[in-house]
From Swiss-Prot:
The modification N6-acetyllysine is found at K213, K293, K300. It comes from Rattus norvegicus. This is Annexin A4. The modification Phosphothreonine is found at T7. One of its GO terms (biological process) is exocytosis. PANTHER family: ANNEXIN, ANNEXIN A4.
Length: 319
């Protein structure tokens, strides 16, 4: 899937020590210069922000993250701290947050595990173990149950074929197996859905979806909706959507985080921060195409203050 890339790029003429001094000045003494903080951090990429953190420590003798935490608050703080966190560690912290304490943020677990590639999943597993002294799979198993648990464990294994290889006979077989596992029988063989959707490569699955439609006269999404339910259904749909068009999947996540009354800030922040350097140029285009309004206008209407300012920069301007 060709993407245009992210809105946040490496700043040219970058000087970590100068940036560190600007940030210190913005936080020193009474009050905080939020605009200066946004001006530096929203216009540097993740790697550069790590260099700034190092320079801050070596030239000022303080921890930039601790200073930011004490100076900032609420959603604006969450965005800035997210931007200051290395990519894989940010995913890991979000997964942990989704399972910590009472209740589970199923949407967060699905979003991260269904959209990351096997190499990213491998690094997530490694980092999770280092951070928390136990495996991601262990925490998933103690926090979820039934088929939802099984699909998450399967995604956590990171066993998806990464090639482009296509075997027409296997495409037909998989499509037929999916049809027989759901639409054609009474009851559903959920494991069959899980094993095909979690292991095959993207090119193969796109052909399976076409063949499935030919056999059953239905989109695979329609069948998943009628054959499964709850978080298991959400997870399978997320996998299919990510295979078809990942930026459109994230556009939908953003739309749902803001539509109606109230805002799901944790989802809004996570998607804006984690996709800023990857496909944030593609997400607004898909948002506009599907919902008829710009992502920029949605964010503008749903947020305020410095929180709004920084998100609009990550969004990349009004399309």
């Amino acid at each position: 899937m060709e993407t245009k890339g992210g809105t946040v790029k490496a700043a040219s003429g970058f000087n970590a020590t100068e940036d560190a001094q600007v940030l210190r000045k913005a936080m020193k003494g009474l009050g905080t210069d939020e605009d200066a903080i946004i001006g530096v951090l929203a216009c540097r990429n993740t790697a550069q922000r790590q260099e700034i953190r190092t320079a801050y420590k070596s030239t000022i003798g303080r921890d930039l993250l601790e200073d930011l935490k004490s100076e900032l608050s609420s959603n604006f703080e969450q965005v800035i701290l997210g931007m200051m966190t290395p990519t894989v560690l940010y995913d890991v912290q979000e997964l942990r947050r989704a399972m910590k304490g009472a209740g589970t943020d199923e949407g967060c677990l699905i979003e991260i595990l269904a959209s990351r590639n096997p190499e990213e999943i491998r690094r997530i597993n490694q980092t999770y173990q280092q951070q928390y002294g136990r495996s991601l799979e262990e925490d998933i198993c103690s926090d979820t149950s039934f088929m939802f648990q099984r699909v998450l464990v399967s995604l956590t294994a990171g066993g998806r074929d990464e090639g482009n290889y296509l075997d027409d006979a296997l495409v037909r077989q998989d499509a037929q197996d999916l049809y027989e596992a759901g639409e054609k029988r009474w009851g559903t063989d959920e494991v069959k859905f899980l094993s095909i959707l979690c292991s095959r490569n993207r090119n193969h699955l796109l052909h399976v979806f076409d063949e499935y439609k030919r056999i059953s006269q239905k989109d695979i999404e329609q069948s998943i909706k009628s054959e499964t339910s709850g978080s298991f259904e959400d997870a399978l749909l997320a996998i299919v959507k990510c295979m078809r068009n990942k930026p459109a999947y994230f556009a939908e996540r953003l739309y749902k985080s803001m539509k109606g009354l109230g805002t799901d800030d944790s989802t809004l922040i996570r998607v804006m921060v984690s996709r800023a350097e990857i496909d944030m140029l593609d997400i607004p285009a898909n948002f506009k195409r599907v919902y008829g309004k710009s992502l920029y206008s949605f964010i503008k209407g749903d947020t305020s203050g410095d929180y709004r300012k920084v998100l609009l920069i990550l969004c990349g301007g009004d399309d």
